[in-house]
Amino acid sequence: MNTLFLHCRPGFEGEVCAEITDLAARLDVPGYSKAKPGSACAEFVCSEAADGERMMRSVRFNSLIFPRQWARGGFVMLPESDRISVLLDALADYPVCGSLWLEVVDTNDGKELSTFCKKFEAPLRKALLKAGKLVDDARKPRLLLTFKSGREVFAGIAEADNQAMWPMGIPRLKFPREAPSRSTLKLEEAWHHFIPREQWDQRLAPGMTAVDLGAAPGGWTWQLVNREIRVTAVDNGPMAESLMYSGFVVHQRADGFTFRPRHPVHWMVCDIVEKPARTAAMIETWLGEGLCREAVVNLKLPMKQRYAEVRRLLDRIESGLAERGLKVSIGCKQLYHDREEVTCHLRRHGK
C-alpha cells in the first residue's frame, strides 16, 4: 500500500501534487507525486510501503486544502467478467473493513461509471461479507474503491474518522428554492466542513449577529437568516426583496473592505471577488480587532502557484494574529461548490 490516491476538482491536480509533496517533505517521506491534467485525481507514490499509512496517520484529512478525498492502496486490473473474484484476491492482504464506498472521479467519464458502480455494489458487498473482508463496524477502516473504468480500480482504505464525510468528498446538498443565488450552497457546505454538526445549535444559534460583506443579492445572507441570525448585509448592489421583508436583515450600502460594525458580531462572512492578499489582510483585521468571533471567507485564487500563494497567505494571517497575542484556529478548504477559490474558516478563542 505505497500509493496515496487523492480526488480533487478537475484542473487542480497540480495543486494537490504540490500540497501532498509538501506534506511528505515535512514528514520526511520519500516519494513522488503524479497527475494527469483534467483527471480530477492525483497520486503520491511512497518509496516505502509503510509510508502511505504513516502519512495518513500523521495528519488530519480536514487540514488538507485541495484534496477532496484520499485513500492508500494500489491499482487492480479487472477482467471483463468475474471481476469480484479478482477483487477478492487483490484484497486478500487488506485489513477487514467496517464500511464500503464505491467512488468515481469527478469527470464526465467518471460520472458515466456511476450506474455501473450502483449495479456492482450489491453483489460485491455480499461477496465481501461472505469472505469476512467486510463487517459492520464503524471503528474499522473504510474500503474505498475508486473506479477509473470498468477494468481498472484503485483499491484503497482510509480510517473512517480521517477522510471525507461524503463519497468522493462531494456533498449532497439541496439548493433551497427561496435562496436568491446558488452561492448559498458554499456557505452551507463550509458549515458542514468546519463545524461539527452537534455544535451548530450553539455556534449558529438564533439571535446571533452577523455581517455579510459583499452580500448582494443575498445567497450567504439567506443561510444566516434561515437560522434566525440577524444580518447586516454590506453591498452597494441590491438585496433580494424576500430577505429584506424577513425582518432579520439591515442593508448597508457601503464598501465591504472599509465597513466596520458599531459593535462586535458573532459572525463575519465574505465572498467578494478581490485579490486574495487584500482579503487576507481584511481577515486579520476583523479577527485581530475583535470585530467578530468566527468568520467564513472565500479567497479567490491566482492563475499560477495557487497552493504556494494560499499557504503564504494562511501563514501571514496566522503569524499576524499570533503577534497580537491571539489564539485563533484557522481552516482552509477548496470546497465542492468553490471554483477558482478556497474557503477559510477562522474562530477566535478566549476574549
From Swiss-Prot:
Transmembrane segments: none annotated. This is Ribosomal RNA large subunit methyltransferase M. Monomer. Keywords: Cytoplasm, Methyltransferase, rRNA processing, S-adenosyl-L-methionine, Transferase. It is found in: Cytoplasm. It catalyses: cytidine(2498) in 23S rRNA + S-adenosyl-L-methionine = 2'-O-methylcytidine(2498) in 23S rRNA + S-adenosyl-L-homocysteine + H(+). The keyword Acyltransferase does not apply. Gene3D superfamilies: 3.30.2300.20, 3.30.70.2810, Vaccinia Virus protein VP39. S-adenosyl-L-methionine binds at residues 183, 216-219, 235, 255, 271. The keyword RNA-binding does not apply. The active site is at 300 (proton acceptor). It is an enzyme of class 2 (transferase). GO terms for cellular component: cytoplasm. InterPro entries: RlmM_FDX, RlmM_THUMP-like, RNA_MeTrfase_FtsJ_dom, rRNA_MeTrfase_M, SAM-dependent_MTases_sf. It holds the Pfam family RLMM_N. The gene is rlmM. Catalyzes the 2'-O-methylation at nucleotide C2498 in 23S rRNA. It comes from Ectopseudomonas mendocina (strain ymp). One of its GO terms (biological process) is rRNA processing. Belongs to the class I-like SAM-binding methyltransferase superfamily. RNA methyltransferase RlmE family. RlmM subfamily. Its main location: cytoplasm.
